[in-house]
Amino acid sequence: MGRFVVWPCELDSRLSRKYGRIIPKNLAIEKPSLDEIIEVAETLNLKIVEVDREKLNPRLSGIDEELRTYGRIIIESPYGKVKTLRLIAQKIREFRRRR
């Protein structure tokens, strides 16, 4: 199992890759919240090691306040980081459609 940090900005469609988005823009989500990511991680049976709501990704320090997303989650996953982020993004889209 791999352990890695998931920042909301890695899933945010409003940001460029320069500011930390990892997954492709067509799979990314607008304004992903930390709570959504936690809910989806639990649904996917990923082990959440730590949640820190005050942290800011260092790449976002020079960007407008409205684009900043605070928080990070440390997750253990049997998949790689990119595959896990894609699964999380896909599930968040499904959850948002239901609401």
From Swiss-Prot:
Involved in targeting and insertion of nascent membrane proteins into the cytoplasmic membrane. Binds directly to 7S RNA and mediates binding of the 54 kDa subunit of the SRP. GO terms for cellular component: signal recognition particle. It comes from Pyrococcus horikoshii (strain ATCC 700860 / DSM 12428 / JCM 9974 / NBRC 100139 / OT-3). This is Signal recognition particle 19 kDa protein. It comes from the Archaea. Part of the signal recognition particle protein translocation system, which is composed of SRP and FtsY. Archaeal SRP consists of a 7S RNA molecule of 300 nucleotides and two protein subunits: SRP54 and SRP19. One of its GO terms (molecular function) is 7S RNA binding. Keywords: Cytoplasm, Ribonucleoprotein, RNA-binding, Signal recognition particle. GO terms for biological process: SRP-dependent cotranslational protein targeting to membrane. Its main location: cytoplasm. It is found in: Cytoplasm. Belongs to the SRP19 family. The keyword Manganese does not apply. Pfam families: SRP19. The gene is srp19.
